């Protein structure tokens, strides 16, 4: 098991690819910091991950488009897990409409979540990665 005992941070962990990555990492023995902007879904993670020990993971509310939120999550992961080995930047959103119908403000939010968040994640996670 290549990730056994490693600490991973997964953004967008409450659904889609993030949830699938979380389950795979837990299956392989990693300890996982699950982050998502959706507080309600995060509160269901204990039920959704009931086949895993709750000591294997911890959830964090996280707006990946916010630099301050990244700083807070990274600080908490370092306190709660002691280190970080793996970063999975899987949070993402879509336009929800065709480009002609999309307001520019919506496009900027998509850009912040899908691109800027990867920069922020790498910027703040890298210094504590072992």
What are the residue ranges of the model-derived segments?
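Conserved glycine-rich Rossmann-like NAD(P)H-binding loop of the short-chain dehydrogenase/reductase
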Residues: 28-45
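The beta1-alpha1 cofactor-binding region of Rossmann-like NAD(H)/NADP(H)-dependent oxidoreductases
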Residues: 39-40, 61-72, 104
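A glycine-rich helix->loop->beta "capping" turn
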Residues: 52-56, 76-89, 95
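Substrate-binding pocket helix/loop in short-chain dehydrogenase/reductase
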Residues: 98-99, 106-111
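A short, exposed helix-loop element centered on a Lys and neighboring polar residues
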Residues: 122-123
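Helix-to-beta-strand junctions that scaffold the AdoMet/dcAdoMet cofactor pocket
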Residues: 129-130
């Amino acid at each position: 098991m290549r990730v056994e005992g490693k600490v991973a941070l997964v953004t967008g962990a409450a659904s889609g690819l993030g949830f699938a990555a979380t389950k795979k990492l837990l299956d392989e023995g990693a300890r996982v910091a699950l982050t998502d902007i959706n507080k309600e879904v995060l509160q269901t993670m204990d039920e959704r991950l009931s086949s895993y020990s709750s000591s294997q993971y911890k959830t964090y509310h996280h707006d990946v488009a916010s630099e301050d939120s990244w700083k807070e999550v990274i600080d908490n992961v370092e306190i709660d897990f002691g280190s970080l080995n793996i970063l999975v930047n899987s949070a993402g959103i879509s336009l929800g409409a065709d480009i002609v119908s999309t307001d520019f403000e919506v496009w900027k939010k998509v850009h912040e979540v899908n691109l800027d968040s990867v920069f922020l994640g790498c910027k703040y996670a890298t210094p504590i990665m072992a």
